[in-house]
Amino acid sequence: CHFSGKSQEVILADRDLYASEQVCLDMSRAVRRLLDGEPLAYVLGEWEFYGLPLRVTPDVLIPRDDTCAVAELAIRKALFLEQDPRILDLCCGSGCIGLAIASRVKDAKVTLADLSMEALAVAKENTGLNRLGGRVRCVQADATKKAPAFLGKYDMIVSNPPYVTGAEMQALPHSVKDFEPEMALYGGEDGLDFYRAIVENYTPALKKGGFVCFEFGMGQGDDVCRILEENGYAILERTRDYNDRERAVLAQYGRKED
């Protein structure tokens, strides 16, 4: 279906259809790429996350079902925030989390931020693909440096930052290690560098009583929560992914003024 440009229904309905020479060539190239270990999402150039069609390239991580945990946690909280909540998706990559939030929280104003201009180009394309341009903007920002003043203040910061440890990087499968962007994977020797940096640099970008929602790797939950608590956050909820692994945390900074 992907290579022919025809829907499954059309192909099944017309058994006299045949693949053109170009379609056969495209499929042959795709099979070779798959046999070389390249992920299917990159071969197709598209993937789905939280019911949204997304463009994906080797400049961004492939959205995974595990990440639905942080998206769902953020959405549940955002639905009960004040009108027109401002939400920052930091280290946004393809924009999958922020776009999922914008698609479900109809009055949310979402900023997709990443250091990589190539990733931001993909995020911007996905914003248009899902017709969310009226409430979503894409900006360049570095999670490891002070939050730029132009960002303003947010009700919530959500992030799936790089969290793979040094040891884990060496053990990643070929399809990840050799194809997905290292800068979106490696989180420092202990995998926690970006959590420390975001809490230090982006807490000032939160409104008083604002929320942070993080995805984290297996076994990192206690350490991520400790980093948050040591910096004035109260842990509100820890949640699991579809494989029953602890995957995300929601925390609140300070208390909202009366």
Could you say what each language-model-derived stretch is?
Residues 189-253:
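Conserved Class I SAM-dependent methyltransferase catalytic core
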Residues 254-258:
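Flexible, glycine-/basic-rich loop-and-beta segments that form/coincide
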Residues 68-171:
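Conserved SAM/SAH cofactor-binding pocket of Class I
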Residues 2-76:
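Conserved AdoMet
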Residues 41, 164-167, 219:
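Active-site beta-alpha loop architecture of Rossmann-like, nucleotide-cofactor-dependent enzymes
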Residues 37, 67, 97, 123, ...:
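Residue-level signal for inorganic ion chemistry
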Residues 132, 180, 206-208:
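Helix-to-beta-strand junctions that scaffold the AdoMet/dcAdoMet cofactor pocket
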Residues 163-193:
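Mobile active-site "lid"/loop adjacent to the S-adenosyl-L-methionine
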